[in-house]
Structures are given as C-alpha cells and as structure tokens.
C-alpha cells in the first residue's frame, strides 16, 4: 500500500502454548477508518495492544509512518488509545481531563485552553468544561475520552470497543458521530469490535479475524456481498449455506452434490478451473445466499429453485423474518419488508434468487470466492 501509515508485517503473538495472532500482515492507509472485527479470542484486541505498545510481538515488525516502534514505550508512539472504560479522572473537571495530555507535554496555559475548547466543541460538548465525569451520561463520557485522545493530535487513534457499554440507541448515535469526527480530522482510526453492524456502518475497510488469522480484508460491501470464507459469510449478518462437493465440471457448468439434491452452476467456473484459480472436481465447497436475496414463488422459475414449506414468520419492525423448511428438514431464512404479501404458514412454495446473488466458496482452504450464475436445483 502506497500511503500505509501502519505496516504490520509477519507478526505473531504467542502466550505459552496459545498462539493468539498468526502471521499477520496488515497495512493501514493514512486517513483510513479500519475496523478489526471478530468474535472474542480472535486476536483483534491483542493486535491493537501491540500497535499501542501494551504488548510486544513475539515475532514480526510493526511500523508507524515507516519507523519501527517495537522498542518505543507507549507514550513515545504517535498513537493514542480509547478504551471502553473511559478511564476519566473523577476528581478532575472535563476541561482538566481533556487538557491532561497537553499539561504533561508542558503546553502553555493559553494554548491548552484554546485547544481544549476547540476539541470540546468538535465533540459537541461545548459548555461542559466545568462539569465532572459523574455529572455526564455514558455517551458524554465517551466523547470526553475521545476528545482527550485526539487533543494530542496523534497520527493514529486506536479504539478498543469504545461503545460496548452504551445502550443501543446511543451506540448508533455515537457510531455516526465517530465517523463524522474521523472524516473531519482526517486521522487514521483503527477500531476493534465484535459488532458486525458497527463495523459495516463506520468502516472504510474491515479486517475479519478468526482464530488469530485475518480471514479477509475489504470494504463493507465486499465483505458482505463477496465473503471469502465460510466463517466470514456466516459471521457477517445472516446467510443460508449449502455444503457439497463438485461432482462434475463440463461445458462451463459445475454440478455440486448436496444432501438430497444437486446444485448446478454455470458461468465463469470453467475458466477459473483452467487458470488454476477456480474450482475443481471433487472439491468440497459452500454455497452462500443472503436472506434478503431470496424470494417466494408459487412455481419454479429460471435460476435456482428450492421446493420448501413456510414454517414461521418473525416480526422485527420494518422487516419480517421468514423461515421455510426444505424437504430434507433444513431451514432457510429469508427477509421481507413489512407489508409485503406473503404465503400462509404451511403453504408449499418455491424459493429462488438471482444468479449473481449466490456465492460459491472454497471450503477447504477458505481463501477464495466465486459468483455463481444460473443456479438451480437439479
């Protein structure tokens, strides 16, 4: 990456027999909002702590602005960290909390005042400088913590699940505020969360970590629409997966054997195989289709068609979640807008989707995806 401000190369972190981060290579662009996303224990927070200087890599290197930082103390690195716990000084006013870093750097009193007031206005807390942390709401405390971190003008701001303690409505509001602030200041944000919606809402790119490995990195659209692994497909939102084996590839068509049926795919599969970048006969694969991409039909139509029976509907506000049962007993999840005409529970229907909405994933190496076309139940 041409303008990488953070460059992580071949980094491993091992605690005893626990290999927490495995051969991580990651470049973060200047001014980018990058999110490290994954479930608990995947290595995302450890990665953040290594950048901050609270942990050291077992092997590998980390550079910020092209300079190695492994031998630098946390306070010597041009990065600041915001934690979920806020870590505000309860005996200090909001002004003094935000000004603390400037005071330690012996910045003049007049400049401190000017920069603190400017930063409080930026995080929409103008007029709060004389209050104490105990007089603020959770969202206000988090904005103070962010202001305190940003006032030192770091090149990189590290955020470790900073919104995790907030209620849902406030969390959504803070997501938009953080994104606005990041774009206004043009500071690189590296954000850690296990919340998929949070990552999709704020990020320029998302790095998905799983069991210490970075499974995929890409834009929110790429991650959601074209997952590279089965883990990514099932971790980001909901999806329907069909596991099977490619039985044959002939004349541009790949036939995938699944339980109680076959899925036939045509299109660019053959070209991929010829180039040794696609799929092969006897390969174990996964087909992934998002619930919102599926549709009801009273009759089979061109494309992929699945006979099923409507089992249940779940109302969740503007969306209705639909559950249908396949002949083999497996369930398929669909999403429809509230108010749409829907078949009755117990009614037998066909489920279909557009060819470009299905994704074929290599299941063994979990490192490649391919769109499927003209998919249907054989």
Walk through the language-model features, giving the residues of each.
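ABC ATPase nucleotide-binding domains
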Residues: 33, 72-234
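The feature captures the beta-strand-to-loop junction immediately N-terminal to the Walker
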Residues: 37-39
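Helix-to-loop junction immediately C-terminal to a conserved catalytic motif
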Residues: 52
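Conserved coupling/switch loops of ABC nucleotide-binding domains, chiefly the family-specific signature
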Residues: 58-61, 111, 211, 243
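Conserved ABC transporter NBD signature motif
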Residues: 60-68
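Non-catalytic connector elements of ABC transporters
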Residues: 239, 249-378
């Amino acid at each position: 990456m041409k303008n990488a401000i953070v460059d992580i190369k071949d980094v491993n972190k091992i605690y005893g027999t626990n290999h927490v981060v495995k051969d991580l290579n990651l470049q973060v662009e200047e001014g980018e909002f990058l999110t490290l996303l994954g479930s608990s224990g995947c290595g995302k927070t450890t990665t953040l702590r290594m950048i901050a200087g609270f942990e050291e890599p077992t092997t590998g290197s980390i550079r910020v602005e092209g300079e190695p930082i492994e031998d630098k103390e946390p306070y010597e690195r041009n990065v600041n960290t915001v934690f979920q716990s806020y870590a505000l000084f309860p005996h200090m006013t909001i002004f003094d909390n935000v000004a603390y870093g400037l005071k330690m750097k012996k910045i003049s009193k007049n400049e401190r005042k000017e920069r603190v007031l400017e930063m409080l206005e930026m995080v929409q807390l103008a007029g709060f400088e004389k209050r104490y942390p105990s007089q603020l709401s959770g969202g206000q405390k988090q904005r103070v913590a962010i202001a305190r971190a940003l006032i030192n003008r770091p090149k990189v701001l590290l955020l470790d699940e900073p919104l995790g303690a907030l209620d849902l409505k406030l969390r959504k509001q803070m997501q938009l505020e953080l994104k606005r602030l990041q774009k206004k200041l043009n500071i690189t944000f590296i954000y850690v969360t296990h919340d998929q919606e949070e990552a999709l809402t704020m990020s320029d790119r998302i790095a998905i970590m799983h069991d210490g490995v970075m499974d995929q990195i890409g834009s929110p659209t790429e991650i959601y629409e074209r997952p590279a692994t089965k883990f990514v497909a099932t971790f980001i939102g909901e999806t329907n997966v069909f596991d099977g084996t490619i039985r044959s590839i002939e004349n541009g068509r790949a036939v995938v054997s699944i339980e109680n049926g076959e899925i036939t795919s045509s299109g660019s599969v053959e070209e991929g195989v010829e180039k040794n970048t696609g799929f092969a006969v006897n390969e174990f694969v996964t087909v992934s289709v998002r619930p919102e991409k599926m549709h009801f039909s009273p009759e089979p139509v061109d494309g992929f068609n699945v006979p099923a029976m409507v089992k249940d509907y779940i109302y969740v506000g503007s969306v209705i979640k639909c559950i249908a049962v396949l002949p083999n007993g497996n369930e398929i999840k669909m999403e429809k807008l509230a108010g749409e005409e829907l078949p009755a529970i117990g009614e037998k229907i066909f489920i279909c989707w557009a060819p470009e909405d299905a994704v074929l994933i290599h299941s063994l190496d979990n490192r490649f995806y391919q769109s499927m076309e003209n998919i249907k139940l054989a």
